[in-house]
Each structure stands twice: as C-alpha cells, then as structure tokens.
C-alpha cells in the first residue's frame, strides 16, 4: 500500500517514503498529538490476507514494545489503515551498520563501542525473554550521534527458544545464511567452529 504525502493514519500524517523491505514499507510521518516526527512501518496491502506475515508483524510490534532500551528501536504505537496494520516507531537519522562497513575499515575503538552497545541491547532483550534471531549488520542502525540501535525484530522469539533436536537446557540459535561460512557451524555459545 503506497501512501502519499498528507495521508492520515489516526493522528499520524505521512510526510515522505523512507524505504521498503520484505515485511513492510516505511514512511516519515508527523505525530500531530505529540508534535514530533516518527517512522511508520506499514505492512503492504498485498500481504494483508497473509496470516503468517500479519502474525510476524504483530509479534515484532509486541516484542519491541516490551523493551525500553537506548540501543533498541523504540515502538510507540500500532494501528490499522484500510485493513493494513502499521507500527509507529522512533525516527532515526544515520545509516545501517552494513552501510558503515561498506565505507571501509573503521577505527577499532569505534567498532568496539558499537559492539558493546549491541550487546547491551541484546542483553536487555534477553532479560525480557526476547531473542532477536536475525541479527546482522543490516539490522543495526547507527544514529548520527553514534548510538547503535537494533532493528527488525520480525523473527523475534518471545518465549525461550527450543528447537527439534536441541536438548532440554540448551540454547538453540539461528543465524542468517549470509552470516554463516560454508563448512562452519554456529555453536550454542555463538562461536563458529569447523564442521567435522
């Protein structure tokens, strides 16, 4: 569902498109009640009848709304517009960690600062029983002020993760295929080892 400038979603007025991905279109909008700029993620109309995508979208909203941490994208509200669900988030200015990495090597101190902030955000999520399950440079945003923010909890698991084949008490993990090297296996503690 492409929204045009001036479209109203409750108290939110669309200003401009910011981007689109597999799970939705993102717009810059104005919250007319609180007089602030926000980002609105709208599930595309073509997916409105897809119950699995709707479930994942609502799961992401619930997972992120349960968290309140400076290194996790803030969610302010959810709603529906002409049958399409939307999520209202804080508006970020900067670039993804992936985009920063593409610019070339960064100073070690800065890389460690980002890593530390990401770990703090993940720890806060884990403390609330939320496991991200799709952490990659594309899902980390670095603001103009240098703060790393974890995005896209669309694959988040809200309860302790247990998969077929994982023994009781083991932590099952999931990583993006692009983050796993051929012949390598991700272990329970997140380290990669050669497959025997």
Residue ranges and their predicted role:
Residues 1-196:
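Conserved ATP-binding/catalytic core of the eukaryotic-like protein kinase fold
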């Amino acid at each position: 569902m492409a929204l045009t400038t001036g479209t109203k979603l409750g108290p939110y007025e669309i200003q401009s498109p910011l981007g689109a991905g597999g799970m939705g279109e993102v717009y810059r909008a104005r919250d007319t009640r609180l007089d602030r700029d926000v980002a609105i993620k709208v599930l595309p109309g073509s997916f409105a009848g897809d119950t699995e995508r709707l479930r994942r979208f609502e799961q992401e909203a619930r997972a992120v709304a349960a968290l309140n941490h400076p290194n996790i994208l803030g969610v302010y509200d959810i709603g529906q517009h002409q049958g399409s669900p939307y999520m209202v988030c804080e508006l970020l200015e900067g670039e993804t960690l992936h985009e920063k990495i593409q610019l070339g090597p960064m100073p070690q101190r800065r890389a460690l600062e980002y890593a530390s902030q990401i770990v703090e955000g993940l720890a806060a999520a884990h403390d609330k029983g939320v496991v991200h399950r799709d952490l990659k440079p594309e899902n980390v945003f670095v603001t103009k002020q240098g703060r790393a923010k974890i995005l896209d909890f669309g694959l988040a698991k809200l309860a302790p993760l247990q998969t077929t084949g994982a023994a009781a008490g083991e932590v099952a993990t999931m990583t993006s295929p692009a983050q796993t090297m051929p012949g390598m296996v991700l272990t329970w503690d997140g380290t990669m080892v050669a497959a025997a």
